[in-house]
Amino acid sequence: MSVIELVYAREVLDSRGNPTVEVEVVLEDGAMGRAIVPSGASTGAFEAVELRDGDKGRYLGKGVETAVANVNEIIAPEIEGMDAFDQPAIDAIMIELDGTPNKGKLGANAILGVSMAVARAAADEIGLPLFQYLGGVNAKQLPVPMMNILNGGEHADNNVDVQEFMILPVGACCFKEGLRMGAEVFHSLKKVLGEKGLACGVGDEGGFAPNLGSNREALELIVEAITKAGYKPGEDVMLGLDVAATEMYNKETKKYVLAGEGKELTAAEMVALYEDWSNNFPIITIEDGLDEEDWDGWKLLTEKLGNKLQLVGDDLFVTNTERLEKGIENGVANSILVKVNQIGTITETLDAIEMAKRAGYTAVISHRSGETEDSTIADLAVAVNAGQIKTGAPSRTDRVAKYNQLLRIEEMVGEQARYCGLKSFYNLKK
């Protein structure tokens, strides 16, 4: 039977050593699902609320015992006895129990943990891998990995302003080869940095985090690493950026502060900077190029570069259909970053992806900087045929767990597996 018999949450640790919520859901016949909720460092103001205890005497105020109690004492009694296959109804009940627009009462970390665990338990009940349970028979496209191999901003303790410099192995024949290419470039970059006397320590997402003279230098180093690994920049491997511009935006001066370079730029100057970079480096995607509330700047960015670059809204959209709808109506961005904990349920996540695709936007499935061994997003990427996944460098087990799951999925799908490379950027006109 697919009836939920037990829902239980506990406090565990994420990749930064901070507490997070783990939930187990057990069905009547013993089928079980377990899920762990991730956590972000650079978070959008419009994200669903991650509930923390605030007790400075315990985990420096970052404990999640309140969220755990909300699962065990409030959510569990309401959904135990429900059918695990009725994911929309279960998610709707949790949203109703919370009663706030941002899940601020029970916590998105409490609600999401249950939502993911229910999906896993339902998949286990019928003996299907999660990607097939969520996506059906047509779930067979493996995503291009967007590998963050050089970290800056909020993800590293260095002077680099741009938060993430990514490589995308678009020239690979399959995911397995794409992962190999990315790993080889990653190791090549380590060698390049070492030869130049630069630090090879890694940031939150597994990428290197050296101090550099400029953001442009980071791009130059990665291009050098791609070449030394035996690949052609712009053909085998493309570049991507997550600027996380909200973190550098001064709301009083309405300028973007590139502290590492000692510059303050207007939105128009930021757009010109991106245009210059994209003309000189094989960049195909830029995430959060402007502040989450700079709609006029985003409009300009999209008009100038939206035909040649994937412009991804993360803080801009926060996996929220209301904000995404506003972006679609105003011709802002052309892609949405999908983070399950930004919205808080599997159902709402799938709704956001569906809305994006219907509007011709791409959807990029993403991790958070505070991750765990949970690999749900790997299955989700294939379930919705997203075509792209962003889950860090091929370094640190919390990142590699997702890549290893995708290797398994590619084997399971077998000859029907597709890896679309550049075709994953289906809305670009260049």
UniProtKB/Swiss-Prot annotation:
SUPFAM superfamilies (alphabetical): Enolase C-terminal domain-like, Enolase N-terminal domain-like
Alphabetical list of PROSITE patterns matching this protein: ENOLASE
Keyword Magnesium: yes
Pathway: Carbohydrate degradation; glycolysis; pyruvate from D-glyceraldehyde 3-phosphate: step 4/5
Signal peptide feature range: none
Database matches in CDD domains: enolase
Membrane-traversing stretches: none
Main location: cytoplasm
Highest taxon of the lineage: Bacteria
Cofactor binding comment, as recorded: Binds a second Mg(2+) ion via substrate during catalysis.
This protein's record includes keyword Magnesium: yes
Broad enzyme group: lyase
Amino-acid positions noted as binding (2R)-2-phosphoglycerate in the UniProt annotation, renumbered to this chain: Q163, K339, R368, S369, K390
GO CC terms of this entry: cell surface; extracellular region; phosphopyruvate hydratase complex
Enzyme Commission identifier(s): 4.2.1.11
Xref: InterPro entries: Enolase (IPR000941), Enolase-like_C_sf (IPR036849), Enolase-like_N (IPR029017), Enolase_C (IPR020810), Enolase_CS (IPR020809), Enolase_N (IPR020811)
Localization, UniProt: Cytoplasm; Secreted; Cell surface
An annotated Gene Ontology molecular function: phosphopyruvate hydratase activity
Active site, renumbered: E205 (proton donor), K339 (proton acceptor)
Protein's name in the database: Enolase
